[in-house]
Amino acid sequence: MKFLRLIPLVLILIFSNLGYLVEASQKYIQISNQKQTESDKIIIYEFFWYGCPHCYNLEPTMDRIEMNLDKDTMLIKVPVALRDTWEVHAKAYYALQQMKLDDNLHEKIFTEIHINGNRLDTKEKLEEYIKDQGYNAKSFVEYFDSFGTDLRVKKGSRLANQYQITSVPTLIINGKYKTSGSLVSSYDELYDVVQLLIEKERVN
Protein backbone atom coordinates (compact mmCIF):
# COMPACT_ATOMS: atom_id res chain seq x y z
CA MET A 1 0.00 0.00 0.00
CA LYS A 2 2.82 2.36 0.82
CA PHE A 3 4.29 1.66 -2.62
CA LEU A 4 0.95 2.46 -4.27
CA ARG A 5 0.81 5.80 -2.46
CA LEU A 6 4.22 6.65 -3.89
CA ILE A 7 3.16 6.04 -7.49
CA PRO A 8 1.48 9.46 -8.01
CA LEU A 9 4.61 11.20 -6.69
CA VAL A 10 6.83 9.16 -8.99
CA LEU A 11 4.61 9.97 -11.96
CA ILE A 12 4.72 13.67 -11.12
CA LEU A 13 8.51 13.59 -11.04
CA ILE A 14 8.71 11.66 -14.29
CA PHE A 15 6.38 14.00 -16.15
CA SER A 16 8.10 17.05 -14.68
CA ASN A 17 11.38 15.80 -16.12
CA LEU A 18 9.71 14.96 -19.43
CA GLY A 19 8.30 18.47 -19.52
CA TYR A 20 11.80 19.86 -19.15
CA LEU A 21 13.05 17.71 -22.01
CA VAL A 22 10.20 18.75 -24.26
CA GLU A 23 10.87 22.38 -23.41
CA ALA A 24 14.55 21.96 -24.23
CA SER A 25 13.82 20.23 -27.52
CA GLN A 26 11.45 23.00 -28.58
CA LYS A 27 14.26 25.51 -28.89
CA TYR A 28 14.33 24.30 -32.47
CA ILE A 29 12.10 22.19 -34.68
CA GLN A 30 13.36 19.50 -37.01
CA ILE A 31 11.47 19.95 -40.27
CA SER A 32 13.27 17.35 -42.39
CA ASN A 33 15.62 14.39 -42.08
CA GLN A 34 17.34 15.35 -45.30
CA LYS A 35 19.35 18.39 -46.30
CA GLN A 36 17.19 20.54 -48.57
CA THR A 37 19.82 22.87 -50.01
CA GLU A 38 21.86 22.45 -53.18
CA SER A 39 25.06 23.95 -51.79
CA ASP A 40 27.95 21.93 -50.38
CA LYS A 41 28.03 24.41 -47.50
CA ILE A 42 25.85 24.52 -44.41
CA ILE A 43 23.25 27.16 -45.28
CA ILE A 44 21.51 29.40 -42.74
CA TYR A 45 18.47 31.22 -44.13
CA GLU A 46 17.38 34.30 -42.20
CA PHE A 47 13.80 35.23 -43.11
CA PHE A 48 13.11 38.85 -42.16
CA TRP A 49 11.13 42.01 -42.88
CA TYR A 50 12.55 45.50 -42.43
CA GLY A 51 9.35 46.65 -40.72
CA CYS A 52 9.56 43.94 -38.04
CA PRO A 53 10.81 45.22 -34.64
CA HIS A 54 11.91 41.71 -33.61
CA CYS A 55 14.02 41.46 -36.78
CA TYR A 56 15.61 44.80 -35.88
CA ASN A 57 16.35 43.61 -32.34
CA LEU A 58 17.85 40.39 -33.71
CA GLU A 59 20.36 42.20 -35.93
CA PRO A 60 23.25 42.28 -33.39
CA THR A 61 22.87 38.52 -32.90
CA MET A 62 22.80 37.92 -36.66
CA ASP A 63 25.96 40.03 -36.97
CA ARG A 64 27.57 37.88 -34.29
CA ILE A 65 26.51 34.68 -36.07
CA GLU A 66 27.84 35.94 -39.40
CA MET A 67 31.15 37.11 -37.92
CA ASN A 68 31.78 33.67 -36.41
CA LEU A 69 30.89 31.54 -39.44
CA ASP A 70 33.52 29.11 -40.65
CA LYS A 71 34.27 28.64 -44.34
CA ASP A 72 31.89 25.68 -44.55
CA THR A 73 28.87 27.76 -43.50
CA MET A 74 26.96 30.55 -45.26
CA LEU A 75 24.28 33.00 -44.13
CA ILE A 76 21.66 34.00 -46.71
CA LYS A 77 19.22 36.79 -45.85
CA VAL A 78 15.73 36.36 -47.29
CA PRO A 79 13.46 39.45 -47.14
CA VAL A 80 10.17 37.60 -47.22
CA ALA A 81 6.89 39.22 -48.31
CA LEU A 82 4.34 37.43 -46.14
CA ARG A 83 1.93 40.29 -46.87
CA ASP A 84 1.56 42.41 -49.99
CA THR A 85 2.67 45.52 -48.09
CA TRP A 86 6.00 43.84 -47.26
CA GLU A 87 6.99 43.45 -50.90
CA VAL A 88 8.37 46.98 -51.18
CA HIS A 89 11.01 46.17 -48.55
CA ALA A 90 11.86 42.84 -50.19
CA LYS A 91 12.39 44.61 -53.50
CA ALA A 92 14.48 47.27 -51.78
CA TYR A 93 16.82 44.66 -50.29
CA TYR A 94 17.33 42.88 -53.61
CA ALA A 95 17.82 46.16 -55.46
CA LEU A 96 20.56 47.13 -53.00
CA GLN A 97 22.04 43.64 -53.22
CA GLN A 98 22.44 44.00 -56.98
CA MET A 99 24.03 47.41 -56.43
CA LYS A 100 26.38 45.76 -53.89
CA LEU A 101 25.09 48.14 -51.23
CA ASP A 102 23.24 45.64 -49.05
CA ASP A 103 26.12 45.37 -46.57
CA ASN A 104 26.41 49.17 -46.41
CA LEU A 105 22.74 49.96 -45.89
CA HIS A 106 21.08 46.88 -44.38
CA GLU A 107 21.40 47.91 -40.72
CA LYS A 108 20.95 51.59 -41.58
CA ILE A 109 17.54 50.86 -43.09
CA PHE A 110 16.48 49.06 -39.92
CA THR A 111 17.63 52.08 -37.89
CA GLU A 112 15.87 54.54 -40.18
CA ILE A 113 12.59 52.68 -39.75
CA HIS A 114 12.69 51.72 -36.07
CA ILE A 115 14.67 54.59 -34.53
CA ASN A 116 14.03 57.54 -36.84
CA GLY A 117 10.41 56.62 -37.54
CA ASN A 118 10.71 56.79 -41.33
CA ARG A 119 8.79 53.73 -42.48
CA LEU A 120 10.32 53.69 -45.99
CA ASP A 121 7.19 51.91 -47.16
CA THR A 122 7.03 53.28 -50.70
CA LYS A 123 9.44 53.30 -53.61
CA GLU A 124 9.47 57.10 -53.50
CA LYS A 125 10.48 57.23 -49.82
CA LEU A 126 13.20 54.65 -50.46
CA GLU A 127 14.46 56.58 -53.48
CA GLU A 128 14.74 59.75 -51.39
CA TYR A 129 16.50 57.86 -48.60
CA ILE A 130 19.04 56.31 -50.98
CA LYS A 131 19.73 59.76 -52.42
CA ASP A 132 20.20 61.23 -48.93
CA GLN A 133 22.72 58.46 -48.18
CA GLY A 134 24.81 59.64 -51.12
CA TYR A 135 24.08 56.78 -53.50
CA ASN A 136 22.65 56.67 -57.03
CA ALA A 137 18.89 56.85 -56.53
CA LYS A 138 18.18 56.49 -60.26
CA SER A 139 20.10 53.23 -60.38
CA PHE A 140 18.23 52.05 -57.28
CA VAL A 141 14.85 52.66 -58.94
CA GLU A 142 15.96 50.80 -62.07
CA TYR A 143 16.96 47.76 -60.02
CA PHE A 144 13.84 48.07 -57.85
CA ASP A 145 11.61 47.82 -60.94
CA SER A 146 13.73 45.20 -62.72
CA PHE A 147 12.75 41.70 -63.79
CA GLY A 148 15.74 40.34 -61.85
CA THR A 149 14.43 41.80 -58.61
CA ASP A 150 10.96 40.37 -59.22
CA LEU A 151 12.52 36.93 -59.74
CA ARG A 152 14.43 37.21 -56.46
CA VAL A 153 11.28 38.18 -54.56
CA LYS A 154 9.40 35.22 -56.05
CA LYS A 155 12.26 32.87 -55.14
CA GLY A 156 12.14 34.17 -51.57
CA SER A 157 8.40 33.52 -51.47
CA ARG A 158 8.92 29.97 -52.73
CA LEU A 159 11.49 29.35 -50.00
CA ALA A 160 9.11 30.75 -47.40
CA ASN A 161 6.39 28.39 -48.62
CA GLN A 162 8.79 25.45 -48.72
CA TYR A 163 9.79 25.98 -45.09
CA GLN A 164 6.29 27.05 -44.01
CA ILE A 165 7.43 30.44 -42.76
CA THR A 166 4.50 32.17 -41.06
CA SER A 167 6.33 34.79 -39.01
CA VAL A 168 9.64 36.64 -38.86
CA PRO A 169 12.38 36.50 -37.87
CA THR A 170 12.81 32.80 -38.53
CA LEU A 171 16.05 30.91 -39.14
CA ILE A 172 16.36 27.71 -41.17
CA ILE A 173 19.58 25.73 -40.71
CA ASN A 174 20.56 23.62 -43.70
CA GLY A 175 16.97 23.00 -44.68
CA LYS A 176 16.50 20.69 -41.68
CA TYR A 177 15.97 22.81 -38.58
CA LYS A 178 13.82 25.83 -37.79
CA THR A 179 14.32 28.21 -34.88
CA SER A 180 13.31 31.73 -33.91
CA GLY A 181 13.20 34.18 -31.05
CA SER A 182 9.84 32.79 -29.97
CA LEU A 183 11.41 29.40 -29.18
CA VAL A 184 14.18 30.67 -26.91
CA SER A 185 14.46 32.82 -23.81
CA SER A 186 17.00 35.28 -25.21
CA TYR A 187 18.94 36.18 -28.34
CA ASP A 188 22.09 34.85 -26.67
CA GLU A 189 20.35 31.51 -26.38
CA LEU A 190 19.31 31.72 -30.03
CA TYR A 191 22.97 32.19 -30.95
CA ASP A 192 23.85 29.07 -28.96
CA VAL A 193 21.08 27.06 -30.62
CA VAL A 194 22.32 28.07 -34.08
CA GLN A 195 25.87 27.03 -33.17
CA LEU A 196 24.55 23.70 -31.87
CA LEU A 197 22.67 23.01 -35.11
CA ILE A 198 25.67 23.96 -37.23
CA GLU A 199 27.78 21.46 -35.30
CA LYS A 200 25.08 18.79 -35.70
CA GLU A 201 25.25 19.28 -39.46
CA ARG A 202 29.05 19.14 -39.48
CA VAL A 203 28.92 15.77 -37.76
CA ASN A 204 26.36 14.52 -40.25
What are these regions (language model features)?
Residues Y56-E59, W86-A90, V184-Y187:
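Conserved strand-to-helix beginnings and helix N-cap segments that scaffold or border functional pockets
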Residues G51, E66-L69, L96-K100, I113-G117, ...:
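Sec/Tat-exported extracytoplasmic proteins
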Residues E59-E66, H89-Y93, H106, K123, ...:
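Extracytoplasmic/secreted envelope proteins and their assembly/folding machinery
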Residues K71-Q98, D103-K131:
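Structural microenvironment flanking redox-active thiols in thiol-disulfide oxidoreductases
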Residues D132-N204:
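C-terminal cap of thioredoxin/glutaredoxin-like
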Residues Y50-H54, A81-T85, T111-N116, G148, ...:
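Solvent-exposed loop/turn segments at secondary-structure junctions
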